[in-house]
Amino acid sequence: MSLSQQAILFIDRDGTLVEEPPIDKQLDTLAKLVFEPMVMPVLTQLQNAGFRLVMVSNQDGLGTDSFPQVDFDLPHNKMMDIFASQGIVFDDVLICPHFPEDNCTCRKPNLGLVKDYLQQGKIDFTRSFVIGDRETDIQLAQNMGIVGIRYDRDAKDWPAIAKQLLASSRIAEVVRKTSETDIHVKVDLDSQAKSTIETGIGFFDHMLDQIATHGGFELNLRVDGDLHIDDHHSVEDTALALGEALKKALGDKRGIGRFGFALPMDECRAECILDISNRPHLKFEAEFSRDTVGEMATEMVPHFFYSIAQAMGLSLHLSTSEGNAHHQVESLFKVFGRALRQAIQKNGEALPSSKGTL
């Protein structure tokens, strides 16, 4: 996710945020203004979790004699004032005033209302949703390439929607293809299912499994690299793809520990201190007793951690003592996994930064 991409909820108005008047389907008086149950606390909860709110509504014939603008404005403005009084802010209110027979490009499920969001790259497609009570809302979501959620006061109310959105697994998938490597990586930070790792380098597979096991997440990784030359591109590009996937899965980083520290001791004394700060840096201290372990060059170990720090935005301090080269390298991957486990663990929705962003 780039800095400009955001998790956005595109929310229908009538029948979703407020009750749709059952007789004439027009919210044109204050007497008809009735909020859907629990919409206020749930929108507050979702907003605090980092979701941006955008209202998207079809209003048939708005501005015509059948639905004068002044009749629309009074209850609509009161609704917006009430939302604002509870700290609920909509970044945009997007309204199509046309009838279906006008064949406009902005009426849902057409994309006219949300065109700027799509063209300007504002949407994080993995964490954005359309919420509405009609099939046209679900069709809009499909046309946008995001997930649609069908609101229903009885079958799928606002608390149920909140549960679905806030419990969404932190999953990310990255495909990286270059002239040297073809990599497919998928991570699930909230699953501890058995990982599947195939890089073509047995010892490297074992090390990556240490990160996933001690990091407490599921990793599925396949690498097809130019191993007939050497291990450089496969190790480097794996680190870049894995770092990108981890960063993507963390989303806006709300609720994470951010910092990690681990100091396990076996034959080798390894130490890792890390900060998911989006300010990449590596300080690495190790003197390996051999040039290779298995089919992996030990000179690629610091390069792996440098690359993953760059891709994930880590400030990373990593060291190990003298010892058997296999145990030295393994201690580094283990200690990194243990520190990462602390840093990515989620507890609440607060952003762990006084700057308001990470």
UniProtKB/Swiss-Prot annotation:
The active site is at residues 12, 14. Zn(2+) binds at residues 96, 98, 104, 106. It holds the Pfam family Hydrolase_like. It catalyses: D-erythro-1-(imidazol-4-yl)glycerol 3-phosphate = 3-(imidazol-4-yl)-2-oxopropyl phosphate + H2O; L-histidinol phosphate + H2O = L-histidinol + phosphate. GO terms for cellular component: cytoplasm. It is found in: Cytoplasm. InterPro entries: HAD-like_sf, HAD-SF_hydro_IIIA, HAD_sf, His_synth_bifunc_HisB, HisB_N, Histidinol-phos, IGPD_sf, ImidazoleglycerolP_deHydtase. It comes from the Bacteria. GO terms for biological process: L-histidine biosynthetic process. Gene3D superfamilies: HAD superfamily/HAD-like, Imidazole glycerol phosphate dehydratase, domain 1. GO terms for molecular function: histidinol-phosphatase activity; imidazoleglycerol-phosphate dehydratase activity; metal ion binding. Residues 1-169 are annotated as: Histidinol-phosphatase. Keywords: Amino-acid biosynthesis, Cytoplasm, Histidine biosynthesis, Hydrolase, Lyase, Magnesium, Metal-binding, Multifunctional enzyme, Zinc. Mg(2+) binds at residues 12, 14, 133. Its cofactor is Mg(2+); Zn(2+). Pathway: Amino-acid biosynthesis; L-histidine biosynthesis; L-histidine from 5-phospho-alpha-D-ribose 1-diphosphate: step 6/9; Amino-acid biosynthesis; L-histidine biosynthesis; L-histidine from 5-phospho-alpha-D-ribose 1-diphosphate: step 8/9. Its main location: cytoplasm. Its EC number is 3.1.3.15, 4.2.1.19. The keyword Cell wall biogenesis/degradation does not apply. Residues 170-358 are annotated as: Imidazoleglycerol-phosphate dehydratase. In the N-terminal section; belongs to the histidinol-phosphatase family. This is Histidine biosynthesis bifunctional protein HisB. It comes from Pseudoalteromonas atlantica (strain T6c / ATCC BAA-1087). The gene is hisB.
